[in-house]
A protein has these predicted regions:
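Canonical Rossmann dinucleotide-binding motif of NAD(H)/NADP(H)-dependent dehydrogenases/reductases
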Residues: 2-32
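A glycine-rich helix->loop->beta "capping" turn
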Residues: 50, 71-82, 90
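The beta1-alpha1 cofactor-binding region of Rossmann-like NAD(H)/NADP(H)-dependent oxidoreductases
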Residues: 57-67, 99
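Substrate-binding pocket helix/loop in short-chain dehydrogenase/reductase
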Residues: 93-94, 101-103
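Active-site helix of classical SDR
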Residues: 117, 154
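Residue(s) in the substrate-gating loop at a strand-loop-helix junction
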Residues: 138
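SDR active-site lid
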Residues: 171-243
């Protein structure tokens, strides 16, 4: 999308963190933004601060996401940009988790994206000049690590859903585009998101402090929500499928694909009658 002035955007998880940063950047180029969030007090504060409308929405419930879409269409008449950004990020070892832990995170991180697509895509397809869906995954949607089982499962899912959606939209000749946002370390409150969970005390998932996790060589290369917002804005303009926020941290992703390639090569060597994909 080239001309963004007066376009209509919906940002879930938009009352704080990356969602707020995305909303601010969209506003800066003339986009009319509606934020949705599960936290009513945060919605009220951010809506007042930015001078925009906020609608309390639990993305894990399709009825609420559908109601959000209908309200936006009723009040604004169109939706051009959808940022499925709401997410949670506590951690826990798989052996310590409950099934409720898995359901809680998948309901928000993965089903929240699916709900957004199903509720809004028909409206985006009505636009003469198309639209854009940006789904927030994570670099943990391409690599995995101990303690991140449900989180990685949900974010891998978001990557796959977005890839398939982009392929299908292209196949049908649609002017709607899809991108997946792959953020690295960002200064948000996602690591303390279990505050929104009623049964958090009994859960195997616990809030984390990224400063205590040895994932990087040297200081953690934090980005701010507004920096992430600029990357999203650039992605809407370019139509790029994969929106990396920390490309300098991509080596583990490449290493993973090399391990996959190695396993494939070993399988070919063990079964010489198969032809090499080269």
């Amino acid at each position: 999308m080239e001309k963004l002035d007066r376009k209509i955007a919906v940002v879930t998880g938009g009352a704080s963190g990356m969602g707020k940063g995305i909303a601010e950047k969209l506003l800066s180029v003339g986009v009319q933004v509606i934020i949705a969030d599960v936290d009513p007090s945060a919605i009220e504060a951010t809506s007042a601060e930015l001078g925009i409308e906020g609608i309390t929405t639990d993305v894990s419930r399709f009825d609420q996401v559908q109601a959000l879409a209908e309200k936006v269409m009723e009040r604004y008449g169109a939706v051009d940009i959808l940022c499925n950004n709401a997410g949670v990020g506590p951690v826990g070892m798989i052996a310590d988790l409950t099934l409720e832990d898995w359901r809680w995170m998948l309901d928000i991180n993965l089903w929240g994206v699916i709900h957004g697509i199903h509720a809004f895509l028909p409206y985006l397809k009505r636009n003469a000049d198309g639209g854009h869906i940006i789904n927030t995954a994570s670099q943990a949607g391409l690599i995995s690590g101990p303690g991140f089982g449900p989180y990685c499962a949900s974010k891998y899912g978001v990557v796959a859903v977005t890839e398939v959606l982009a392929q299908e939209l292209e196949l049908e000749g649609s002017l709607v585009r899809a991108s997946v946002l792959l953020p690295g370390p960002t200064k948000t409150a996602i690591a303390t998101s279990s505050r929104h969970r009623k049964d958090a005390v009994a859960a195997g998932l616990k809030d984390m402090d990224l400063n205590d996790i040895d994932l990087f060589d040297g200081p953690i290369p934090w980005k701010t929500p507004t920096e992430i917002g600029q990357i999203v804005l650039d992605g809407v303009a370019s139509g790029e499928l994969y929106l990396f926020t920390h490309p300098e941290l991509s080596r583990p992703i490449f290493d993973r694909f090399e391990r996959i390639r190695g396993a494939s090569d070993r399988a070919l060597n063990a079964n010489p009658h198969h032809e090499s994909p080269d």
